[in-house]
Amino acid sequence: MQISEKKPLIVAFCCNWCSYAGADLAGNNRLNYPAEVKIIRVPCSCRVNPTFVLRAFQRGADGVIICGCHPGDCHYTSGNYYTRRRFALLFSMLEFLGIEKERTRLEWVSAAEGAKFAATMEDFAKTIAALGENKRLEDLRCKR
């Protein structure tokens, strides 16, 4: 009898204008990225509230990645600058909560970078797999 290895659950918040289009391009070019990556399309990376990341961890995510437009290329002018400042604070808060900083990542991927999107997801999935299951999940889960 074989023991099945649990694959990590990864939530990817992707900007509609760049990163989601990059994911679409990766798919159209038949570039593989891990099936355990679940993509959530958002209008802009600045619309990802830090509570969304915490909620993803509460609901069982082993890793969360936020993907947006390159700085200076935001469809909403300065959304990604706001994202960068906001998530610098979130990353330090996650460490305070006992969640390894490697479990969360912020990446810039343009609509023309399908290969970069696939490579980024592959790299992040390997990082999360090496970390193993999120041990803090039981403490973070909502008790109902």
Give a label for each model feature.
Residues 1-144:
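Iron-sulfur-associated redox domains of electron-transfer enzymes in respiratory
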